[in-house]
């Protein structure tokens, strides 16, 4: 009941006359300390009238407001955007949560007052996107109350049954299930509208809010009424992909509108529930949970039994289309192989600047795989790393810094990767090394950034002797500061000579070592 009291002994009770929602209470250094869910850490003391009073300002850490990490993406301006409410079969009834990390500072979108304005509970925000034409303008999808609109993090509108074509599956305005928000290249906002209740169901499962404010409703019988149309994406060809994650009606849907949004007569569309793999085996995936496209145009899909890859997604509409399950050799002399992560439920897949795959599992932590998926570069778990939990819910990678944000069931962590998005060309001001100079007490790696894909790197001393060489991972290269004999290099100036894979373009920079 948002109250706090203190027993001095079995017969004496002191009540705190403040409305605090506390989750932790202790005594230290002459203060009673209350950990409050919304107000941070607060110090309290008894006054002269033996009444407990708040005596310190609220201490709120620079951190996420809640440990809800079901959806994450990186905005165009480099900020991290998080939506805190997902669906696991059905809605979770989590308080509406949208958080942003900008310049190492956390902030949250408005929550208070939304219920009073809409007449509906504000909860289960499962997806949020930034308007590509206005960085202060956002839309957020909910698992039951439709679509919310924000400006400068403040609520401005709700779209539901009564003011838009959004549909409910059962006649109630708390069953308007929206998800999968994505903008296309023409700044039209796409979304899924899913749900069914016994015989009723949503008839038009894809909705589009055009840049001019006009709505379009698209009807495709193969996905109409499905319960959980969740993650979506546009591929390099402009096709729209949707996954259905509900275990009873899971599958993957692909749509090619031929560029005519308001004329569906020429559309190509197809829904596949159970894929056939390269061996002709029909797979039972036990659910489909995430989808992404890699640098080569292959589509990686996370299922309940490992990842599958669509190496030729342009053939998706053909009758003989098949997926690929990666076979990892056992290397035990038997010539046998195992399907990649076939025993793991895959909740999240992200592709870094080096086309490597970060794969988040339900119970086994996160894997970093080589571009082809055959090599495990890292396998981080709660037991061998700072991961807070082995249940990975979401992954987002900052394209310019390579920082990998990992949302777990117990909170958010990040890992500084050695891969960034590659540049199209070498630009003198963008190619540099850091830290520079390298001071005596520094023992970490030196990073060269601003590179193109597969840059050939040679590091020499002033006399031209080769000290180290290698190839960039995406747009970045890291060096441990050691020579080819494994010894730390002495003081001096070292030249970094960079060339593209064809050897037709090059650039140089310098690193100063102080020992």
Residue ranges: model-predicted function:
Residues 395, 472-476, 513:
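A short acidic/small-residue loop/turn micro-motif
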Residues 466-489, 500-504:
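Glycine-centered tight-turn motifs at strand-turn-strand junctions
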């Amino acid at each position: 009941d948002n109250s706090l009291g203190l027993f001095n002994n079995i017969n004496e009770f002191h009540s705190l006359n403040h409305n605090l929602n506390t989750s932790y209470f202790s005594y230290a250094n002459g203060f009673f300390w209350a950990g409050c869910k919304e107000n941070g850490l607060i110090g309290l003391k008894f006054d002269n009238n033996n009444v407990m009073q708040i005596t310190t300002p609220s201490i709120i850490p620079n951190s996420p407001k809640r440990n809800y990490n079901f959806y994450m993406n990186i905005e165009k301006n480099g900020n991290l955007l998080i939506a805190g409410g997902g669906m696991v079969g059905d809605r979770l009834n989590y308080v509406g949560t949208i958080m942003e990390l900008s310049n190492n500072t956390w902030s949250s979108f408005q929550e208070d007052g939304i219920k009073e304005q809409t007449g509906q509970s504000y909860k289960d925000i499962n997806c949020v996107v930034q308007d590509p034409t206005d960085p202060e303008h956002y839309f957020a999808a909910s698992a039951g109350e439709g679509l919310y609109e924000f400006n400068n993090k403040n609520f401005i509108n709700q779209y539901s049954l009564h003011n838009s074509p959004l549909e409910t599956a059962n006649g109630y305005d708390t069953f308007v299930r929206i998800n999968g928000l994505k903008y296309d290249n023409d700044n039209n906002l796409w979304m899924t509208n899913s749900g069914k209740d016994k015989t009723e169901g949503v008839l038009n499962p894809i909705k589009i809010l055009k840049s001019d404010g006009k709505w379009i409703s698209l009807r495709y019988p193969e996905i109409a009424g499905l319960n959980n149309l969740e993650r979506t994406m546009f591929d390099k060809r402009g096709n729209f992909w949707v996954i259905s994650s509900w275990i009873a009606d899971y599958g993957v849907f692909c749509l090619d509108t031929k560029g005519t949004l308001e004329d569906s007569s020429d559309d190509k569309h197809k829904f596949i529930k159970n894929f056939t793999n390269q061996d002709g085996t029909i797979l039972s995936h036990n659910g489909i949970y995430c989808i992404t496209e890699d640098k080569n145009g292959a589509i990686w899909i996370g299922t309940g039994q490992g990842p599958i890859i669509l190496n030729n997604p342009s053939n998706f509409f053909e009758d003989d289309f098949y997926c690929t399950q990666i076979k990892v050799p056992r290397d035990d002399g038997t010539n046998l192989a195992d399907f990649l992560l076939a025993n793991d439920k895959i909740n999240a897949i992200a592709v870094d600047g080096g086309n490597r795959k970060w794969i988040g599992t339900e119970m086994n932590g996160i894997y970093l795989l080589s571009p082809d998926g055959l090599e495990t570069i890292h396998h981080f778990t709660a037991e061998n790393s700072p991961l807070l939990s082995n249940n990975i819910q979401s992954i987002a990678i900052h394209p310019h810094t390579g920082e990998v944000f990992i949302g777990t069931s117990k909170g958010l962590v990040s890992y500084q990767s050695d891969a960034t998005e590659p540049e199209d060309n070498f630009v003198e001001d963008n190619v540099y090394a850091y830290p520079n100079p390298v001071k005596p007490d520094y023992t970490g790696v030196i990073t060269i950034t601003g590179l193109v894909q597969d840059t050939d790197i040679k590091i020499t001393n002033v006399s031209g002797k080769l000290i180290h060489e290698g190839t960039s991972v995406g747009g970045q290269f890291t060096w441990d500061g050691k020579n080819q004999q494994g010894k730390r290099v002495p003081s001096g100036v070292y030249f970094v000579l960079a060339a593209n894979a064809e050897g037709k373009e090059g650039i140089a920079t310098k690193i100063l070592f102080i020992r």
